[in-house]
Amino acid sequence: MLNELSTRKCTPCQGGMPALDRSEAERYLSQAPGWSLADNGSRIERHYSFRDYRSALRFVVDLSQLAEDEGHHPDISFGWGHATVSWQTKKIKGLHENDFIMAAKTDQIAGDGNGSA
């Protein structure tokens, strides 16, 4: 099923706006299965499993291209058969709708959306 968030584009965040509060973040989180709040609700993260290093690397490269296209960049760590992605809007030191849009798009890149590809 295509997540509605994945069809949207990021809007430039200029800073100076408030981050989503916890209840707003949880509402968006309900549309991003597999993602969880981290750092006291200031970012979201998800762990993905892959069959080998090359698959994890391909995911990271594809996600990096998407981040460049959207102008919104995650923190990524990866190794053999795994990757962890974290989204946060750095200009507001918290979560913005863009983070959840990118989470949905990240799931599309990962393949089946359940954290394994």
UniProtKB/Swiss-Prot annotation:
One Gene Ontology biological process: tetrahydrobiopterin biosynthetic process
GO molecular function, one term: 4-alpha-hydroxytetrahydrobiopterin dehydratase activity
First-tier enzyme category under EC: lyase
Catalytic activities: (4aS,6R)-4a-hydroxy-L-erythro-5,6,7,8-tetrahydrobiopterin = (6R)-L-erythro-6,7-dihydrobiopterin + H2O
Xref: InterPro entries: PCD_sf, Pterin-4-alpha-carb_dehyd, Pterin_deHydtase
Superkingdom in the source lineage: Bacteria
Enzyme Commission no: 4.2.1.96
CDD domains given in the database record: PCD_DCoH_subfamily_a
Keyword field: Lyase
PANTHER family associated with the record: PTERIN-4-ALPHA-CARBINOLAMINE DEHYDRATASE-RELATED
Family: Belongs to the pterin-4-alpha-carbinolamine dehydratase family.
Protein name (database record): Putative pterin-4-alpha-carbinolamine dehydratase
Species name: Azoarcus sp. (strain BH72)
Taxon lineage: Bacteria, Pseudomonadati, Pseudomonadota, Betaproteobacteria, Rhodocyclales
